[in-house]
Regions:
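Long, His/Glu/Asp-enriched segments that create or flank divalent metal/ion-associated functional microenvironments
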Residues: 1-199
Length: 199
């Protein structure tokens, strides 16, 4: 169990054998049956979970990524929860930004971790292109599949899942990269403004 400001996240192994099982699934505390947030790591097929991606994904989903972000959600007086879970620009965008931040500040334990971070960034960039072109009917599912495998380092299974996501939630993949770019732009602006005082 990882902990951030008394808001722990439990990392669980799962062995999901569904048709398109996610390798990593993050469940904030509000969506989890457990008293903590849960990060499920699917160990059913280890060939789909390369070690060079694992460290980058732990930054994206754990601390300082999406768990850190969703742990700061506020609960109102009527117990209603302000949730950012369905704002991919904010959640996934922040997660991708933290993976990049870890790369910029040399927090990866090996060059393979950095490689995994770059590959995931490329994957989301490829998904952005597919998301836009699929939903403008400029690309067939078959063409999208080939593109994601060649340009996004996707397995056939993860590419099918990305295509399905783009069909069911148009703009979700685009939103994630838009969020990453927005966080990078904000950082650049404050680096310029603060100079040596930027930390």
């Amino acid at each position: 169990i990882l902990n951030v400001e008394n808001k722990p996240i439990e990392v669980r192994a799962s062995f999901d054998q569904g048709s398109t099982p996610a390798q990593f699934a993050y469940h904030p505390v509000q969506q989890s049956s457990a008293p903590t947030a849960v990060l499920e790591v699917n160990l059913n097929d280890m060939s789909k979970l390369p070690l060079y991606e694992a460290e980058a994904k732990s930054f994206i989903y754990g601390i300082p990524g999406m768990h850190q972000l969703t742990s700061t959600q506020t609960i109102g007086e009527d117990d209603s929860v302000f949730s950012v879970d369905n704002l991919p620009a904010f959640t996934i965008g922040w997660g991708l930004y933290t993976a990049k931040l870890a790369r910029d500040y040399d927090l990866y334990r090996s060059p393979y971790g950095k490689l995994g971070s770059l590959m995931l960034e490329s994957r989301y960039a490829a998904r952005l292109i597919v998301d836009i072109k699929l939903n403008q009917n400029l690309l067939s599912d078959e063409q999208a599949l080939v593109f994601l495998k060649e340009q996004g380092f996707e397995t056939a299974e993860s590419a099918h899942l990305a295509i399905s996501t783009s069909r069911q939630s148009p703009g979700k993949q685009t939103s994630a990269i838009s969020g990453l770019l927005a966080f990078m732009s904000l950082r650049s602006r404050f680096e310029t403004k603060l100079g040596d005082r930027f930390n």
